[in-house]
């Protein structure tokens, strides 16, 4: 059944760049002990046991080759592993098609000698062998075609999958069919977006504008039908939600877009998803929603991902709030952003913290600063303010080093090694800033005089 593909794999297995020197360059097997055992497919006795052990070993070698990105070697192992489709063990025989598809598609995606025809041929054969995996394979095949810019072929593939049925429809089949339909919707959205771009270049009084508008409306109706069912099912459907919201907004259905995004973010049936809150926030921002509403959305995002890039925007909203609780949270948000290693070089975060520390202390809220510092005093000095980081930061970005030095001085006192190192540096442009920083640290530091760190 897989003989044609097996031959193709054999060719791929020998497709090294240097066929004369590569140990995997020939079209024959190079593992005689493996070939001998695998070809001994019988129904009982020692050989049956040997077959199971050998195919298991073959799978391990195959996985190892994939992990090392040895695509030609993996193709050769796959050529052998195909024999497991004839395994006498029912469970292994049923599991084989899915394993072969997952590993085989990975090989064909990356193999230097593979092409669309080879991949498609493999996908079509696997659909017929692993009927229970038909929808998954069809969907992944369509995504592969999309990756290669073959939109019409991908759409045709999805249309065939949409009408496919096998036995009684299970719950998992139902979700996969919805997913197939939704991806069709994404393709339709792509066509709709292109028409939208073309429409923006036409005069509204032009006949072509009216005709294209009607065409777009028809396209959006199809897209809605295909996407709607899926996004009502609990799950993470970011690209589908974004596409649908874009169309709702374009046609002026703000209420529909708001309801969809609110449900996507807050419905307890859906898994926790930071992006759902991001999309809702961005929509409300476009609507010019009140600050309190924006804060309430970002507050939940902050609880899920305290290092999210929107946290600096969240801080700005909190800082401008008239509520003391919000302004206090604004300080905590900055500290929490800088708790993460990926944010240590974020100069905007350090600028915001330096400025807000000074403002907070000027407004006599020293206890806010001390509360945040209490849980960090044992690890932030080494994490942010060591002598090593002082030299490294100054060399890489003097402006960043100045902002950090001010924060270090406020939190650790003027005896802090980071602060002292930056203070001694000679920089024509930053000379005045460093002088002002020295005065501010002396005035606002939360450390008692004489304490050195």
From Swiss-Prot:
Compartments (UniProt record): Nucleus, Nucleolus
**Do the record's keywords include Transcription?**
yes
Q: Which GO terms describe its cellular component?
A: microtubule cytoskeleton; nucleoplasm; RNA polymerase transcription factor SL1 complex
Give the record's keywords alphabetically: DNA-binding, Nucleus, Transcription, Transcription regulation
GO MF terms here are: DNA binding
- Coarsely, its chief localization is nucleus
Region Disordered, annotated ranges: 1-22
Entries under InterPro entries matching the protein: RNA_pol_I_TAF1A/TAFI48_chr (IPR016629), SL1/TIF-IB_Component (IPR052669), TAF1A (IPR039495)
Name under which the protein is recorded: TATA box-binding protein-associated factor RNA polymerase I subunit A
Native source species: Rattus norvegicus
């Amino acid at each position: 059944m897989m003989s044609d593909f097996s031959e193709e794999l054999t060719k791929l297995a020998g497709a090294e760049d240097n066929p004369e020197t590569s140990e995997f360059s020939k079209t024959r097997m190079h593992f005689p002990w493996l070939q001998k055992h695998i070809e001994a497919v019988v129904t009982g006795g020692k050989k049956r046991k040997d077959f199971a052990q050998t195919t298991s070993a073959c799978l391990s070698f195959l996985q190892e080759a994939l992990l090392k990105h040895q695509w030609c070697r993996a193709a050769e192992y796959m050529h052998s592993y195909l024999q497991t489709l004839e395994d006498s063990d029912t469970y292994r025989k049923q599991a084989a098609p899915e394993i072969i598809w997952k590993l085989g598609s990975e090989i064909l995606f990356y193999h230097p000698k593979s092409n669309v025809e080879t991949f498609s041929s493999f996908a079509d054969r696997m659909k017929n062998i692993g009927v229970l995996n038909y929808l998954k394979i069809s969907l992944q095949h369509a995504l592969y075609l999309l990756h290669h810019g073959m939109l019409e072929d991908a759409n045709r593939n999805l249309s065939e999958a949409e009408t496919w049925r096998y036995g009684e429809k299970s719950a998992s089949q139902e979700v996969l069919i919805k997913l197939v339909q939704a991806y069709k919707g994404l393709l339709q959205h792509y066509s709709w977006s292109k028409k939208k771009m073309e429409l923006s270049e036409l005069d509204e009084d032009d006949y072509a504008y009216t005709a294209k508008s009607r065409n777009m409306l028809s396209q959006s109706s199809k897209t809605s039908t295909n996407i709607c069912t899926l996004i009502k099912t609990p799950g993470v459907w970011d690209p589908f939600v974004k596409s649908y919201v874009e169309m709702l907004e374009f046609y002026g259905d703000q209420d529909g877009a708001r309801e969809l995004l609110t449900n996507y973010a807050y419905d307890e049936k859906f898994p926790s998803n930071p992006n759902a809150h991001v999309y809702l926030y961005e929509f409300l921002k476009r609507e010019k929603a009140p600050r309190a509403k924006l804060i309430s959305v970002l507050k939940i995002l902050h609880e899920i991902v305290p290092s999210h890039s929107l946290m600096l925007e969240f801080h700005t909203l909190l800082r401008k709030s008239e509520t003391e609780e919000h302004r206090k949270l604004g300080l905590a948000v900055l500290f929490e952003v800088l708790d993460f290693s990926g944010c240590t070089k974020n100069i905007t975060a350090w600028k915001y913290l330096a400025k807000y520390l000074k403002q907070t202390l000027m407004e006599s809220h020293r206890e806010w600063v001390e509360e945040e510092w209490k849980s960090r005093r044992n690890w932030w000095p080494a994490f942010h303010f060591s002598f090593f980081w002082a030299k490294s930061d100054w060399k890489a970005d003097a402006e960043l080093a100045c902002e950090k030095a001010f924060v270090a001085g406020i939190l650790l006192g003027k005896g802090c090694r980071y602060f002292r190192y930056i203070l001694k540096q000679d920089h024509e442009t930053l000379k005045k800033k460093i002088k002002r920083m020295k005065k501010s640290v002396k005035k606002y530091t939360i450390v008692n005089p004489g304490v050195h760190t």
